[in-house]
Design a protein with these regions (language model features):
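N-terminal catalytic cores of secreted or lumenal carbohydrate-active enzymes
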Residues: 33-188
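Acidic-and-aromatic substrate-binding clefts and catalytic sites of carbohydrate-active enzymes
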Residues: 62-78, 215-222, 242-250, 266-276, ...
């Protein structure tokens, strides 16, 4: 007898009771119970990098910008390239970059709340501002390609965020120029709200990220996200998701239309979080065919406890197998933590 049901954070089961009967006529023999299919469903394996998912990127860094912080060409160099202590480019580093907002929108709402058209327009202007963010990534990528002799048609991947237009937002703003503000309670209006692309030579738009880290179980959310996934797919892009540890919706990620989902172990930021989060996260993502987020605290270079917590993610990659043949997404709490090692000053 097997019970399968979704259990999210702060949920559990007190008791299960099975009532059988002596008459076994019509029962399925265990040998014919298709247990191999059940086993495969519960052990899908890690999501490996492949051209069919996120256009092949395997190590994607989350690039948080804000109302008062943007990335320059110089900022991107140690993300794009492995640098020695003299700043010489020795190899590539991350091959994908996700642009997402840290903090609030200009309207004052958080990223996962009821953002409106002017917020999204501001976000696009920031991402594609001259000399900053995506534009800076393009010029930095050109330098790395030239130094390493990479093929002219090689492109680093970048991704844009889709922020949560709450279904009860009835005055989003006029997207399609028909003089009528879009109503996010209507799915046909949500289908119009798709981020824009820009033509680059050294970087390539490779997908969209659904920003909200948890999904409620309402039929409305299911339809909304699937509609957005359909829109991105029609344009040749993937929609993906990075849920927090055991967030609601994790076990149904594929049913929402995501090309992949990358779960956060959420071990590194809170010193009271148990080490078991690493193993449990690895077990869950392997069972569900997901990938993993590697997280590092901004205090890792100054406080030993946080540094050691980061090392547990790397050890877990060896112990549980997600170091190879698994997409990794990297959450850096403070800019520069991952690449301070190339500097000449002791840390």
């Amino acid at each position: 007898m097997r019970f399968v049901y979704g259990v999210y954070t702060w949920a559990g089961c007190a008791e299960l009771t099975v009532y059988g009967k002596k008459n076994a006529s019509g029962a399925t023999a265990l040998a014919n119970a298709n247990l191999e299919k059940v086993r495969m469903a519960l052990d899908a394996g890690y999501q490996a990098p492949t051209k069919s998912v996120l256009k092949g990127a395997g190590d994607i860094c989350l690039m948080y910008h804000s109302l008062d912080y943007d990335y320059t060409e110089k900022d991107f160099m140690p993300y794009l390239a492995y640098l020695d202590t003299d700043g010489n480019i020795k190899d590539t580093m991350f091959d994908g970059f996700l642009f997402l907002l840290s903090g609030k929108f200009p309207s004052g709402v958080a990223q996962h709340m009821n953002s409106v058209k002017t917020d999204w327009e501001w976000e696009l202007k920031q991402v594609f501002a001259n000399g900053k963010n995506a534009m800076a990534l393009e010029t930095a990528a050109a330098k790395v390609k030239k130094e390493l002799g990479l093929a002219d048609d090689y492109k680093f991947k970048y991704y844009l965020s889709v922020y949560y237009p709450r279904p009860d937002t009835t005055n989003f703003g006029d997207v399609d120029g028909d003089g009528v503000s879009e109503d996010c309670s209507k799915f046909e209006d949500c289908r119009k709200i798709i981020n824009k692309n820009a033509a680059f030579k050294n970087i390539e738009l490779a997908g969209f990220y659904w920003f909200h880290e948890a999904i409620d179980s309402s039929e409305n959310s299911y339809k909304l996200i699937n509609n957005i996934a359909d829109q991105t797919k029609e344009r040749g892009y993937d929609l993906f998701w990075i849920p927090y540890y055991c967030a609601s919706g994790v076990s149904e990620w594929a049913e929402y239309g995501f090309a992949t989902a990358c779960m956060q172990p959420n071990y590194v930021f809170n010193l009271t979080t148990p080490l078991s989060n690493i193993k449990n996260a690895a077990d869950i993502i392997k069972r569900l065919g997901m990938c993993i987020e590697i997280e590092i605290s901004g205090d890792a270079l100054s406080k030993d406890a946080y540094y050691r917590r980061y090392l547990e993610y790397l050890k877990g990659g060896i112990y549980y197998g997600y170091m190879k043949d698994c997409i990794h997404m990297y959450c850096v709490q403070q800019s520069g933590v991952f690449f301070q090692c190339h500097g000449k000053v002791d840390i």
